């Protein structure tokens, strides 16, 4: 440790992720699969789709304004099958689960506020949204949530590819990272809870998970002999998925975003079309934040924007660079207002959000993803920002 590091604050920060077979994430994926189907057939649709999965059944509720017909039963069963609930012995399977449809029509009171006479789109609700970016990883995300998502994605991979064939779909991971100042330096603890077949010993599960999951994705230089591994710390984890816990859309909002590294406005994403600023404005905030950091304006930034229902322009914009900016924050705020159209219509157009891209966002985080379709992760405004702020 350098002399400078000794004077900096030391702390441990923890984030978690869950697998695609976690009941809350099952609900998110079902809601977004329904959204994808509807938006593919009717891009102007308004969708608010909520899902409940529990012991042997699934309930779909919410409001639609669309000309499309969505085969709800077929969509639900396909998602559950693709996740991996294919056997009745898992306690929930795509063939036998009951599917109840309680979808209704969107209130005309909401419709009139969203569809404005001048062609603009009013915010679908009031609310506040946050975006964040930092230099802890190549994708400009905090390290703890980034690593937690790598673990849960790997749990699904080793299950589906037969590397650890006795695993079942439900699972969680948690990472505790030590910081000195604002710099992550080591992984202090890893927690993995994974559903499994009943005949497998905990000793074998521990050995396989440490070797094929943890060490496969966490860089060796971040771990040491002092790193703690807690694998299924309660003992066996046979009963899982909707049989073990009910799942609801929108209950993993910190997993979906930054793992607790920045504030959250409280609005969930899944099942909502992009006129809902809970979703689209949070994506826009991330896009702005990532481009500011990528442009070298700051090393870390938190952005908040807020809306009133039926009003297109944000009622407020706040930028906090955590004392890492090379220009005044007021100038950065002016830059953002000038270069980024943060009306719902502007966000939808600039990020190309009227596409069936949402189910894949519903697991392993909405941010820090480099797959096709995650337009809010593009650093395509860097040169515009540099030019406006007159920085190299």
Curated annotation (Swiss-Prot):
Complex formation: Homotetramer; dimer of dimers.
HAMAP family in the cross-refs: S_AdoMet_synth1 (MF_00086)
Record: residues binding L-methionine: 63, 106, 245, 276
Binding site for Mg(2+): 24
One Pfam family, short name: S-AdoMet_synt_C
Catalytic reaction list: L-methionine + ATP + H2O = S-adenosyl-L-methionine + phosphate + diphosphate
Organism encoding this protein: Sulfurimonas denitrificans (strain ATCC 33889 / DSM 1251)
Alphabetized CDD domains for the sequence: S-AdoMet_synt (cd18079)
Transmembrane intervals: none
UniProt key word Isomerase: no
Protein's job: Catalyzes the formation of S-adenosylmethionine (AdoMet) from methionine and ATP. The overall synthetic reaction is composed of two sequential steps, AdoMet formation and the subsequent tripolyphosphate hydrolysis which occurs prior to release of AdoMet from the enzyme.
Record: residues binding K(+): 50
Gene3D superfamilies for this protein: 3.30.300.10
Designated name of the protein: S-adenosylmethionine synthase
